[in-house]
Amino acid sequence: MIANLTGLFLSVLAASAVLPSVIADAKSAKLETTDTMIPSGEPGVELFVRNKHRAGKQAFSADKIVLFVHGATYPAETAFDLPIEGMSMMDLIASRGYDVYLVDVRGYGRSTRPAEMSQPPGANKPIVSTKVAAHDLGAAVDFILKKRHVSKINVMGWSWGTSIAGLYTSENNNRVNRLVLYAPQWIRTEPRAPAAANAPPLGAYRLVSKDSARERWLKGVPEDKKSDLIPPGIFDAWADATWATDPDSSKQNPPMLRAPNGVAEDNANYWTAGKALYDPTKISVPTLILQICQATWRRVILLS
C-alpha cells in the first residue's frame, strides 16, 4: 500500500517515477523531522502536525509543499509515516525535495481527544463531523502558510480525508495549489441496508480491535492472495504503532482504538442518502482523483 500511494502521489506532483535508484537515494537522504502541536482555533483543542524535509533546507515554493490528511479510523502518522523496510511514504516524498506535512484532526492520533471520548461511547451523539475536520485541516494549512511564507500549498486526502480536503478546498481555493483525492467518498448508488430494529443509536465514537481491523482488511481476499496484500510483519507493525497513538487503548483487553463517529453520521446523512456533502463544482484548483480498481483495495482504503 505504501509503495502504491507513494508512486501515485509523486506522479501527481510531477516527481520522478519510483525506481530502485530513487528508493536508494531516499534511504540515504538526511531528513529533518519536527512534531508540533498547533492551536485549532478553539479553546482546549490542539492538533498534531508532523513535518519532514531534507536537512538544512528551509525555503520551499508552494508547489513543493504537501499536506496529508488521514481517513475515518486511523491517524495520519501511521498511514503516512510508518517505516517499512527502513523508509516511509513521507520519507520518500521528503527525500525528493518536498516539504511534507501530516495532520491528525481532533479525536485522532496525538491530537486532542474531545471530552466525549472519555465517556462511554453511547453517552453522547457522534463527534468530529467532516465540517469540524475541515476546520482542523484549515488550521494546519494556515500554520504552514505562515511558517513557509507562501499563499497556498498542495493538499492530499485519503478516503474520508478526501471529503475533508474536498470540503475545505471548495471553500478555500485560494489556499490550495493542487488537490489530490485518493479513494474518494461519493454518493452511493446501491440500495441502503435496512437498519436493525434493535440497533442502538450511533454513539460519539466506536471501538476498534486489531483483530477486527485485520479481518476487514482481508475481507473477500482469496486465501492465496492474502500474503501478497499484507507482507509478513507489516500488519503487526502498523497495528502496534497505530493503537499506541491512543493513550486509552491499553486500558482494555484486547486493546481498543477509539475513533470518532462523525464520519459515520455524515455517511448516513449524505453519501448513502444520495446527497453530496460538498459541492465539487466549487473546486477550481487542479485536482487529481485516484480510484482503486480492485474491490478489495477499495475496502481497505474506505475503512482506513
Predicted regions and their residues:
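Glycine-rich "HGGG/HGxG" loop immediately N-terminal to the catalytic nucleophile
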Residues: 76-77, 103-125
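N-terminal cap/lid segment of alpha/beta-hydrolase-fold proteins
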Residues: 27-61
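Alpha/beta-hydrolase
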Residues: 190-290
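Conserved hydrolase catalytic core segment
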Residues: 151-190
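Conserved alpha/beta-hydrolase "acid-adjacent" motif
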Residues: 295-302
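Short, surface-exposed "cap/lid" segments of acyl-processing enzymes
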Residues: 56-102
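Alpha/beta-hydrolase active-site loop
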Residues: 121-147
